[in-house]
Structure formats: structure tokens, C-alpha cells
């Protein structure tokens, strides 16, 4: 499952949450599609782990991620404006020089990345795996 994979990738056990929504449009010939998952956590203990993590970053989002998230390129992705929390970005594109850097996101003809944003006010994570 994608929570277990992301947990291994980002170093925080995200599997303790409950999936409240999941959509996945992957499955085409080239594996293109969007996976969108919302996970609810019982408290903010996950946020405390993110605060100590080197791969999760405090909001606000950098400009590229903010543009992608709030002017979405896909109708499947709908995330509320989040003021307090953390985000995680991992660029899986074959041309990526640094997978944790979003600066080249719009310099390519396709997207292949994992993005998660945690809302501390609702204790929810919104997870996107985007492949084009």
C-alpha cells in the first residue's frame, strides 16, 4: 500500500492513521495517473515526528508546490488551504538531480513525484502520487 511505501521513504510511520478517502487513476499503458489519499490521525503525535524529520518541512509551501497544489493540474486533487503543518516532496522523475528539490518541477514535459501535506489543525495527511 502507498502509506507503507511512503513511510519507508520519509522515515515516519504513517500507517497508524485511518484512510478516509482514496482515489487512484493509475493503470494506463504507461502507468500514468494520480493516486490521491486522505488519512486521519487520532492526534498530533505524527506532527511531532515531522518536526524532528529532515525530509518533512514546515509550511508555507515553496512556490512550485503551492502553484501545483492550489491551481491543480488534475480534477482528482482537491486539498484545502492549509496554514499550519508540514509537507514532504519526493521527485521520482528520471531527470531529477535531487529528489527532495522541487525547483525543476515545471522544467519538464512530465511529472513523476510523491507529495504529502499534513494539516496540524485537522490531523490529516493528503498524499498525492502523480505520474504523467
Question: Over which residues does each language-model region extend?
Answer:
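Functional cores of ribonucleases/endoribonucleases
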Residues: 55-131
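N-terminal export/targeting and maturation segments
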Residues: 1-60
